[in-house]
């Protein structure tokens, strides 16, 4: 048995591998990530709660493919051009500030006056009757402000988290520090999901104040407006401002004096790299290593998109109005946060003790097991129902899907993100900066958009199709892409080892 002092040191190494001299940098970085992930959790629930009850879960495929993906491409072009002209710090302020400004505009101006800005239902119904194959595009046009909010909420994840925050972190930490810092950063950051879920549940549980009606109808009242959406958006904007403030503190007061934490090589990496847009694109295309990182993200995005659509359709069946949908997603965020923090504690030790390959493989393994169980349950729900009688199988299906979503995303946030970010570190500054910009923004959304393309194509050709009617085809795609993901990880690991030597 180990002496108490040695046992305590071992326990501290597992739970908190951060040295005391590193706390000056680590604490503001962790708080910054907490604020950013709080916004991510809240925005993820808000965007789904707007579009699914009012337009149907099938609309998500069209939003991701026809709106989110083009927006990501446009943003990437603008970002690469800005990175050649502006300091990264000012780019960060400009981008985050733009997001926060739009959220305020949506909550306080567009949403309360949506009856003025949106076309009337009679006109929309007539258009759908005349052009049934285009009904999903017509529905998007009927709620264009919801679609715009969906785009900005999706871009928050791709841009602010995957691109801005992690690129900043990769410029600061080398591979050795990343193994210790990234899992703990993620663990603390995911507490933001728990806080976001609690905020959503708090505001959506006010049944004694308003009836549980569709939010679009209840928002004819300005008092309902302030009770539900505006306070949540105000908290989101406040968290964003705090994140920008912490970012400024790190740049102005910590990095300049942090030679004990950052070596000279990493300090120099904060300098700006000039690279033309065409050269950047060629650099990405000709790099097999960057291509494999992109394929990791594409596989994950496609598989999650394929599973989430049927799951959200089931949630709508159980919670057809927006307030109840928000409440459910709030509870989902709470359990997601708890699961993520738990996985972060486990994941940090897996990464440090078992290495990159095992850590990277655990996410697809987790997703394949839980996803397969969910698909089988949905496909054979009637057969399963004969064994349980009058039991609420719809509720069980939603819980099975929620468990799948929570476990797969928990392993993704704790292991996939950390291993993916570590894969960038051995690269040159040019590949790390410009390559990451394209891979993170376009790659992230291309995976989801590929799944969305498959689904939306079916819904366009067969207007009466639903997720229940195409579930077996989604299962086949799920199995094929899962095998491709695992094969790509094994190949990428060999190249990663060579670069680290």
UniProtKB/Swiss-Prot annotation:
Subcellular location: Cell membrane
Pfam families given in the database record: TLC
Membrane topology type: Multi-pass membrane protein
Transmembrane segments: 23-43, 59-79, 90-110, 146-166, 183-203, 227-247, 293-313, 326-346, 361-381, 383-403, 446-466, 470-490
Domain of life according to the entry: Bacteria
Main location: membrane
Keyword terms: ATP-binding, Cell membrane, Membrane, Nucleotide-binding, Transmembrane, Transmembrane helix, Transport
InterPro entries according to UniProt: ADP_ATP_car_bac_type
A GO CC term assigned to this protein in UniProt: plasma membrane
GO MF: ATP binding; ATP:ADP antiporter activity
Similarity section: Belongs to the ADP/ATP translocase tlc family.
Functional description taken from the UniProt entry: Provides the rickettsial cell with host ATP in exchange for rickettsial ADP. This is an obligate exchange system. This energy acquiring activity is an important component of rickettsial parasitism.
Name of this protein: ADP,ATP carrier protein 3
Protein source organism: Rickettsia typhi (strain ATCC VR-144 / Wilmington)
Taxonomic lineage: Bacteria, Pseudomonadati, Pseudomonadota, Alphaproteobacteria, Rickettsiales
């Amino acid at each position: 048995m180990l002496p108490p002092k040695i046992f305590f040191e071992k326990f501290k190494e597992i739970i908190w591998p951060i040295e005391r001299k590193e706390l000056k940098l680590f604490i503001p970085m962790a708080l910054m990530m907490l604020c950013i992930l709080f916004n991510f959790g809240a925005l993820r629930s808000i965007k789904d709660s707007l579009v699914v009850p009012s337009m149907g879960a099938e609309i998500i495929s069209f939003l991701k493919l026809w709106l989110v993906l083009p927006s990501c491409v446009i943003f990437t072009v603008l970002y690469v051009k800005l990175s050649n002209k502006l300091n990264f710090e000012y780019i960060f302020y400009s981008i985050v500030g733009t997001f926060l400004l739009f959220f305020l505009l949506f909550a306080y101006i567009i949403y309360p006056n949506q009856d003025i800005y949106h076309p009337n239902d009679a006109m929309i119904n007539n258009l759908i009757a005349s052009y049934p194959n285009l009904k999903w595009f017509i529905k998007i046009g009927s709620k264009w402000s919801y679609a715009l909010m969906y785009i900005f909420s999706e871009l928050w994840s791709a841009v602010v988290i995957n691109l801005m925050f992690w690129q900043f972190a990769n410029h600061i930490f080398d591979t050795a520090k990343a193994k210790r810092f990234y899992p703990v950063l993620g663990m603390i950051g995911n507490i933001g999901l728990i806080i976001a879920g609690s905020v959503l549940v708090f505001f959506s549980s006010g049944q004694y104040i308003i009836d549980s009606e569709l939010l679009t109808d209840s928002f004819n009242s300005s008092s309902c407006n302030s009770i539900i959406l505006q306070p949540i958006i105000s908290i989101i904007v406040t968290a964003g401002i705090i994140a920008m403030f912490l970012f400024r503190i790190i740049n102005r007061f910590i990095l300049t004096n942090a030679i004990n934490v950052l070596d000279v090589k990493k300090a120099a990496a904060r300098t700006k790299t000039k690279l033309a847009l065409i050269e950047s694109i060629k650099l990405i295309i000709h790099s097999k290593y960057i291509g494999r990182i992109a394929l990791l993200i594409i596989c994950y995005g496609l598989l999650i998109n394929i599973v989430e659509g049927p799951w959200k359709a089931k949630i709508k069946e159980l919670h057809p109005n927006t307030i109840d949908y928000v409440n459910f997603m709030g509870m989902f965020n709470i359990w997601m946060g708890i699961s993520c923090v738990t996985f972060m504690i486990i994941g940090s030790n897996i990464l440090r003790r078992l290495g990159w390959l095992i850590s990277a493989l655990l996410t697809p393994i987790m997703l394949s097991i839980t996803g397969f169980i969910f698909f089988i349950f949905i496909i054979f729900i009637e057969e399963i129902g004969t064994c349980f009688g009058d039991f609420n199988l719809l509720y069980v299906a939603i819980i099975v899907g929620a468990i799948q979503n929570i476990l797969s995303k928990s392993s993704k946030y704790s292991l996939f993100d950390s291993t993916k970010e570590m894969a960038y570190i051995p690269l040159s500054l040019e590949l790390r900066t410009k390559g990451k910009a394209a891979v993170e923004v376009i790659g992230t959304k291309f995976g989801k958009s590929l799944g969305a393309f498959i689904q939306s194509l079916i819904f366009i050709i067969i207007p009466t199709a639903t997720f229940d009617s195409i579930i077996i085809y989604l299962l086949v795609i799920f199995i094929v892409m899962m095998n491709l993901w695992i094969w790509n990880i094994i190949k990428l690991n060999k190249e990663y080892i060579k670069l680290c030597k």
